């Protein structure tokens, strides 16, 4: 199974988010899965990458050519992308399930882009697991409900999103995706 992980590249992250990234990465690696991610060598990207590899998993980094100087040299495979849009497209095509860890606008962009992509595909097996730790994604989830309430979004699309509030719950949802 190939699991995309979207997460922050910032280095000044609170310890609780680092621990969550480590837990998810450890789960991925210990289940012989392959992680597909942004491929960079800093922030939660580096944390989750290290946890996957230490636990026996493999990692595929998808890196825009313009920022390749920051890529993680420990990636098992690196795929270069023309730009950020190409990176997202490649990650979506390579992955079976998508995990969105707490992050900033980049992670939010990846989540929304993936959600939109999945809404136009008939393959309902692909899911998004949103780690809503400390309610970090509450506002976007509320906005989706507003769109549903105003008939701007099909409520059935929300079935593609599984919401976890802890790394442990995220791993339980990942296990369900293996079935």
Language-model-detected regions and their locations in the chain:
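Active-site/ligand-binding-proximal alpha/beta "capping" segment
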Residues: 86-122
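Short glycine-rich anion-binding loops that position phosphate/pyrophosphate groups of nucleotides
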Residues: 8-11, 65-67, 103-106
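Short, acidic/small-residue loops that bind anionic groups at enzyme active sites
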Residues: 62-63, 101, 117-141, 155-157
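Glycine-rich, charge-decorated loop segments at or immediately adjacent to ligand/cofactor-binding or catalytic sites
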Residues: 43-50, 136-148
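Acidic/glycine-enriched connector segments
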Residues: 42-100
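A charged, well-structured terminal subsegment
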Residues: 97, 150-179
